[in-house]
């Protein structure tokens, strides 16, 4: 895959449920602590190395931000780092929280 794909929250949720992909959240620490998808890994400059060690390059990665804009740059970056399949989640955490309020965790 040379380019990331955009995915809606329903499809992202299904991929998580079926363990077909991992989810990363690139929002700032305060926003992440105030609410994030239950299975999300908080991906920051400080946690990138650990994420890359723990997730093979053939593992599909879904990137979540606030509204689905910043995630596009991060998705492209992960492709450049060697990940084979990367998605940017349309609508970001705002859409996730609206559609799946029971699947939001709080705290870091």
Curated annotation (Swiss-Prot):
PROSITE patterns (UniProt xref): RHODANESE_3
Keywords: Cytoplasm, Transferase
Quaternary structure (record): Homodimer. Monomeric in the crystal structure.
Induction trigger: Expression is positively regulated by cyclic AMP-cAMP receptor protein (cAMP-CRP).
Task of the protein: Transferase that catalyzes the transfer of sulfur from thiosulfate to thiophilic acceptors such as cyanide or dithiols. May function in a CysM-independent thiosulfate assimilation pathway by catalyzing the conversion of thiosulfate to sulfite, which can then be used for L-cysteine biosynthesis. The relatively low affinity of GlpE for both thiosulfate and cyanide suggests that these compounds may not be physiological substrates. Thioredoxin 1 or related dithiol proteins could be the physiological sulfur acceptor.
Cross-referenced PANTHER family: FAD-DEPENDENT OXIDOREDUCTASE, THIOSULFATE SULFURTRANSFERASE GLPE
Name by which UniProt lists this protein: Thiosulfate sulfurtransferase GlpE
All residue ranges annotated as the Rhodanese domain in the record: 17-105
Reactions performed catalytically: thiosulfate + hydrogen cyanide = thiocyanate + sulfite + 2 H(+); thiosulfate + [thioredoxin]-dithiol = [thioredoxin]-disulfide + hydrogen sulfide + sulfite + 2 H(+)
Disulfide bonds: none
Provenance organism: Escherichia coli (strain K12)
Superkingdom of this protein's organism: Bacteria
GO BP annotations, alphabetical order: glycerol metabolic process; sulfur utilization
Gene Ontology CC: cytoplasm
Miscellaneous section: Overexpression of GlpE can complement the growth-defective phenotype of the thiosulfate-grown cysM deletion mutant.
GO molecular function, one term: thiosulfate-cyanide sulfurtransferase activity
E.C. number: 2.8.1.1
Activity regulation behaviour: Incubation with the cysteine-specific modifying reagent DTNB resulted in a greater-than-90% loss of activity. Does not exhibit anion-specific inhibition.
Residues at the catalytic site: 65
